[in-house]
Design a protein with these regions (language model features):
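N-terminal leader/domain-start detector
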Residues: 1-19
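Short alpha-helix boundary/capping and kink motifs at helix termini
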Residues: 14-70, 82
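A short, basic-hydrophobic beta/loop patch
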Residues: 55-106
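Hydrophobic transmembrane signal anchors and adjacent membrane-proximal interface regions, especially
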Residues: 3-4, 14, 27-30, 42, ...
């Protein structure tokens, strides 16, 4: 299996990050087999489109919550990487576990 899991919907709380907020998070390598998708449907035209990265962020968005990595945005990029026999993906990772720990200490 390419991903750790496939589900529909986000199990984590809403984070309210804008695209500008996401752009401040540096991308890092994430293994595809550590990701759980938050959508079951992939638009084939987005997967096959050469200019699919023209709009939006170049890097997928992932959210860590309760020690699980969820792929929030960029499923087509992750599948494209898998089709090219890549096991890792560069993505921006929002760690809600870290934010929760900081909030509890404050």
């Amino acid at each position: 299996m390419i991903f750790k899991g496939v589900r529909e919907g986000k199990p984590y709380p809403e984070h309210h990050l804008s695209y500008r907020d996401w752009s401040r998070i540096p991308p890092r390598q994430i293994r595809l087999d550590e990701l759980v998708t938050t959508t079951k449907v992939l638009a084939l035209d987005r997967l096959l489109s050469e200019d699919s990265t023209f709009y939006g962020d170049l890097f997928p968005h992932a959210v860590k919550w309760k020690n699980v990595l969820y792929l929030e945005d960029g499923l087509h990029r992750a599948v494209r990487a898998a089709l090219r026999n890549r096991t890792v993906l560069h993505a921006r990772l929002l760690d809600l576990d870290d934010l929760d720990a900081v909030t509890r200490r404050a």
